[in-house]
Amino acid sequence: MAYRRLLLPLTGTAAGEAALATALDVARIWSAHLHCLHVRVDARDVAPLAGEGLSGAMIEEMMAATERESGERAGRVRQLFDRFAAIHGDLTLASDPNTALKTPGVTISFETMAGREEDVVAQQSRLFDMAVVPHPEAEEDVSSSDALHAVLFDSGRPVLIAPREAPKTIGTRVAIAWNGSAESAAAVAAALPWLHRAQAVRILCSDEYQRRGPLA
């Protein structure tokens, strides 16, 4: 068992570089494909939020401003991706994740979609073996916390939160939080590839946190 398809939602550029480096390290471990996804705000979603009492012209102006800002942000994210791919010349650029696995070695791709970020990211994550999410505390990327929440609770897939700075090593020492629940069992099953290759694994448990189920 291995993680062959990784998803990295790039919400902005503040924590994007560290997230890209972390995700690439994971992809190298598993010879996986890394798919970078940026979700643009759909200007049409702004109209219902505009509130009553606004004229049609004001709503159109608001939608135009949203579209412009969304486009500029998408451009910055794409530039970040292109710079990163250029620095790592050994990567193979793929047109999409569906054909990437036919290419040997680590591959990488980029896609932009429009919609509600938390919905798109959670839904797309279900198509991948694991999601790598940028650190949510970067000031520029306020929406990254929404993406993280969506992936954690709505994707059903394992999630790796990238640190503020790319680590020198990853996955060598693993901690398991166990309380006997079905959720903890599912988390352990999803983490088995990491557990098999880890140098050390520690199980954390607490009588106060224990639920009905097997003990650690």
Predicted region positions:
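Residues at secondary-structure transition points
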Residues: 14, 68, 72, 115-119, ...
